[in-house]
Swiss-Prot record:
Region (Disordered): 731-750
Pfam families: Penicil_amidase
Official protein name in the record: Acyl-homoserine lactone acylase PvdQ
Family statement: Belongs to the peptidase S45 family.
E.C. no: 3.5.1.97
Subunit structure: Heterodimer of an alpha subunit and a beta subunit processed from the same precursor.
Protein's cellular compartments: Periplasm
Bias type Polar residues, positions: 731-746
Function statement: Catalyzes the deacylation of acyl-homoserine lactone (AHL or acyl-HSL), releasing homoserine lactone (HSL) and the corresponding fatty acid. Possesses a specificity for the degradation of long-chain acyl-HSLs (side chains of 11 to 14 carbons in length).
Note: AHL-mediated signaling mediates quorum sensing in many species of Proteobacteria, regulating hundreds of genes, including many that code for extracellular virulence factors.
Cellular component GO terms, alphabetical: periplasmic space
Gene from which the chain derives: pvdQ
Keyword Hydrolase: yes
Signal peptide: 1-25
Organism of origin: Pseudomonas syringae pv. syringae (strain B728a)
Length: 779
């Protein structure tokens, strides 16, 4: 057993802990000294036990810093708007956002008043968790500083944190589905009189491209699958849950696996995002749950009609209103190492900040566009997840989500030991119904971006007395479904969660009916139907949905590709021969041993997405699981496009230097731990449930940056939960840690691990180790 003594004070890197005034100032009177017991089991997963929230937070912050100090320190720099100060304005964040634009966003977002308001809205339990987290993190930081910080963050930008930093991190997560996607557009919004046409066009065009690409990547990088099986279909007659969130493998959205216990009050295990002292996805003694990124709208744009006399004033109900002006300043590192303060004015209307995208959301002499983000007023998010963590029944779990309404931009799926399966699309959504949308928007714009008339008050969000926040939908008017067979979700609307009970008739901002399903949802519904026909559904069946790596779209189009290959190809026959042979030999999966035919297939189908007439059978809302399907190779234009796509695929593979005998495991890898590990899975758009997003690496390889992250399959018996799982990218982001690649290797080998939950299971783990930490009481 490792027993750590209380640490009284630390001085390092020229900084004393006495300087963390914000954190110290926020400590509530009467706090007892924090004490936590951190028990580590296999793969370094911490099981943290404490008598109260402060002690629990203390253990969480300490354990997290042991495993991910550099990661969190870097994110703290980001949310403080200080990247330009330390790294220069022209470099980019991990999310490929320009440092200067990022800093301006967070300087605008995380003002002292915004942080104070958020903190004041938190109940004592949440404050205690956060205060404990800060103390635990700072203790670990001091210890590691004495020993020598990890090389990636042995730098001046690493410092003790405060509760304000945790608030900043939380608010950053809240706006991921809204204004967070508009950093460049917010930073570049400039009144027409101050615009320099050529310069602004170039800068803003780039901003638009980056933001649009990030908007598209949002669902890809933060997608997910979840399946909740009820007692009618489960092999043991109890609830059974598959959680398969697809999240980034690095940065501020990288999950951390842990188990949190306050005896008699809390006992929950699962995964959490950086800086959060609670579980986001997991299970407790009574239930298990997961989240999937929803398709609901969490912000609206408002077209402002400008005052002809002044483009920084707008007309509202016929009255001229001055835009708000908030000056933010970013400290920018100069070439000689000195700092220069760069001021910028962020303009806003009553709806929110003005954003500017040339050619799409222009700020000219007539109009400007303002963005209203529903989650900017969501100060309930931490209370929400803590209530879910503590829920002792599915009803209590559901009631908490209905009442608190703190879920920012995800659906929730859950099961309980009694065999109920629950789906809730209860996130924070602007209260704009179909009638108001019809009155207040241009139908030609569509619903990809909701643009409302900003010149009329009646077009603002409706306020309902039932809602937890002014201007959002009350939970009673959002999709919910309780079943005893199944519910599932893979980032489509709520419509086809279970085809036996379609969820229809909601505001377009919440959920849209009659839209084509994504390939992963079609795969899941098809697989569940097959399993249902064959008998009861087992844990192994749910694991196989992820790990057998079926490429669902191959079943729809591969026969047509092979038929085309067997047709008269003329002068292209010789060039296409390797491709056609590889497609014929391919097993239709994204496994490590799957052949190079999968690479050709990806490239072909990516090219064919631009061909609107490619499907032989068009989408039919009466049969959304099986349509659209088949490549219309008998259509001359489709055949021409297909031939071109195949030839381009041949050229791409040759250019990448991939040998004919290459296997998918030779190509798709993860090397974030410092060594290359083959990774199975593939693109979500092809119907690979085990979705992976990659970027180009060296020698034709693809480096995984996002995808399957925390995996869990949970069911129940008389004693409680029985869970198996994995954290695909491993527990630690420090390449020097023993736990930076161990779970990644297990994931590569498809080796699910039993998750120790009970005291007996934890203490019986071969890797069991205990560390007790405590702090001195307040004096």
């Amino acid at each position: 057993m490792i027993i750590s003594r209380p640490l009284c004070s630390f001085v390092f890197a020229g900084l004393s802990f006495a300087v963390i005034l914000p954190a110290q100032a926020l400590v509530e009177p009467g706090n007892q000294a924090a004490r936590a017991e951190i028990r580590r089991t296999g793969f370094g997963v911490p099981h943290i036990v404490a008598a109260n929230e402060r002690g629990l937070g203390y253990g969480i912050g300490y354990a997290y810093a042991q495993d991910n100090l550099c990661l969190l320190a870097n994110e703290v720099v980001t949310v403080n708007g200080q990247r330009s100060r330390y790294f220069g304005p022209d470099k980019a964040t991990l999310e490929q956002r320009n440092n200067m634009a990022s800093d301006l966003l967070f300087q605008w977002l995380n003002t002292p008043q915004a942080l104070a308001d958020f903190w004041n809205a938190q109940p004592r339990e949440i404050r205690q968790l956060m205060q404990g987290y800060v103390a635990g993190y700072n203790r670990s930081l001091a210890e590691q500083t004495t020993q020598g910080l990890p090389q990636p963050c042995a730098a001046e930008w690493v410092r003790p944190i405060s509760t304000d930093d945790l608030l900043r991190l939380t608010r950053r997560l809240l706006v991921e589905g809204g204004v967070g996607q508009f950093a460049e557009a917010l930073a570049g919004a400039t009144p027409p009189a101050q615009q320099k046409p050529l310069q602004v066009d170039a800068q803003q065009a780039q901003a638009l491209q980056l933001a649009a690409a990030r908007n598209q990547r949002f669902a890809l990088e933060r997608g997910s699958n979840a399946v909740a099986i009820g007692r009618e279909l489960s092999a043991n007659g109890r609830g059974m849950l598959l959680a398969n969130p697809h999240f980034p493998w690095g940065g501020g959205m990288r999950f951390y696996q842990m188990h949190l216990t306050i005896p008699g009050k809390l006992d929950v295990m699962g995964a959490a995002l950086p800086g959060l002292p609670l579980i986001n996805i997991g299970f407790n003694q009574h239930l298990a749950w997961s989240h999937t990124v929803d398709t609901s709208k969490h912000f609206t744009l408002h077209r402002l009609q400008l005052d002809p006399k002044d483009s920084t004033r707008y007309l509202l109900d016929g009255q001229s209103v001055a835009m708000g002006k908030q000056q933010v300043s970013v400290d920018v590192k100069q070439a000689d190492g000195s700092l220069k303060s760069v001021p910028r004015i962020v303009y806003s209307s009553i709806f929110g900040p003005v954003v500017q995208w040339p050619g799409k959301l222009d700020w000219d002499s007539k109009f400007a566009f303002s963005l209203r983000d529903a989650n900017l007023q969501n100060d309930r998010v931490l209370q929400q997840w803590y209530a879910m963590d503590k829920a002792d029944s599915l009803k209590a779990f559901q009631d908490s989500v209905r009442k608190i309404q703190g879920i920012p931009w995800v659906n929730t799926l859950a099961v309980d030991a009694q065999g109920q399966a629950l789906y809730m699309n209860l996130s924070v959504v602007p209260n704009v119904d179909a009638a108001r949308l019809a009155r207040c928007s241009d139908p030609r714009i569509g619903t990809e971006l909701i643009v409302l008339d900003g010149s009329r008050s009646e077009c603002n969000w409706e306020v309902s007395a039932e809602a937890a926040q002014a201007g959002i939908y009350p939970s009673s008017r959002q999709p919910q479904l309780l079943r005893t067979d199944f519910v599932q979700h893979s980032n489509d609307s709520a419509w086809m969660v279970n085809p036996a009970a379609p969820l229809q008739g909601f505001s377009p901002l919440i959920s849209q009916d009659g839209q084509p399903l994504g390939q992963r949802a079609r795969f899941a519904l098809d697989r569940l139907e097959s399993l249902k026909t064959a008998g009861k559904i087992s844990v192994e069946n749910l694991q196989a949905m992820v790990m057998d790596n079926e490429v669902y779209q191959a079943g729809q189009v591969l026969p047509d590709l092979l038929t085309f290959c067997a047709s008269e190809l003329g002068d292209d026959a010789a060039r296409l021969a390797p491709l056609c042979a590889a497609l014929k030999d391919w097993d239709g999966r994204a496994d490590l041993n799957s052949g190079i035919g999968f690479v050709y297939f990806q490239k072909i189908m990516t090219s064919m997405q631009a061909v609107a007439s490619r499907w032989r059978v068009a989408f039919d809302p009466q049969d959304p699981v099986h349509t659209p399907s088949g490549l219309a190779i008998e259509n001359p234009s489709v055949a021409t496009a297909l031939r071109a796509a195949m030839l381009a695929a041949v050229d791409d593979v040759a250019k990448a230097g991939l040998p004919a005998g290459s296997k998918w495991g030779d190509i798709q890898v993860s090397s974030i731990s410092g060594k290359q590990i083959p990774i199975h899975g593939g693109p979500a758009g092809l119907g690979v449930y085990n979705a992976m997003q990659t970027v180009a690496g060296k020698d034709g390889k693809r480096e995984v940056v996002s995808g399957t992250s925390y995996l869990q399959v949970v069911t129940f018996d008389e004693q409680g939960p029985k869970a198996q799982g994995l954290l695909a990218f491993s527990e630690s982001s420090n390449p020097q840690s023993a736990h930076s690649s161990d779970q990644t290797e297990a994931f590569s080998k498809k080796q699910w691990q039993a998750l120790p939950f009970t005291e007996q299971q934890i203490k019986a783990d071969p890797a069991y180790e205990v560390q007790v930490i405590s702090e001195e009481p307040d004096r």
